[in-house]
Amino acid sequence: LVPTPNAAPDPRNEETRGLLIHSATPVHNDARRLQAVLEGGVLLNGNSELVDRLNAIIYRDGTLPLGSKGTATLFLGDTRIATNVRLFAGERALGTRASQVVREHVLDEGKVWLDTAFVVNDYYVSGYEPVLDSYGERVGMLYVGFLEAPFSDAMQGALLTLFDDL
């Protein structure tokens, strides 16, 4: 785990759990009798392809203000296990954690977060949603967001232009 500003205290040093997509389907013979079960899974920890694809679908070219960037993250608990959020050195922010206020709202209370949030090292316009396991228990979060500053600057410029003409 990477020390993260505004995250809840956590005595752990590392994330030892895994989050995976698991699927199984029956295989029947011609007489419709069960012959086998085909089972498979994909470990989502470190799965950059998933968040990069999600990010590409949501934030197409030209949809954000100049200087902003779209981001997506999959959390196990409040820990980033797949993300395109970057640390200062440009590496993916794996092992960093969500802020305590987001964690409480989404994981503890089971609510969707649609607001500004501190994400690793800056403020983002953010959406977080609980990820549920097959028993309906909250096990993580899905996040998408974009840098707040370029959006705020563009909105402020638009408002100044609008009211300057009045």
What are these regions (language model features)?
Residues 29, 75, 133-134:
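Short, acidic, Ser/Thr-enriched surface-loop or helix-capping motifs
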Residues 3-10, 15-27, 111-114, 121-131:
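A short beta-strand signature within small-molecule sensing/ligand-binding domains used
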Residues 1-12, 47-61, 81-118:
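Extracytoplasmic/periplasmic sensor domains and loops in membrane signaling proteins
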Residues 64-67, 71-79:
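Short hydrophobic alpha-helical segments used for membrane anchoring or interfacial signaling
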Residues 147-166:
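Membrane-interface helix-start motif
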Residues 18-23, 34-36, 70, 122, ...:
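Envelope-exposed proteins and targeting segments
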Residues 36-43, 125-152:
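Short, hydrophobic beta-strand elements of compact beta-sandwich sensory domains
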Residues 31, 44, 76-81:
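Short acidic/glycine-rich beta-turn/loop cap or linker motifs at sensory/regulatory domain boundaries
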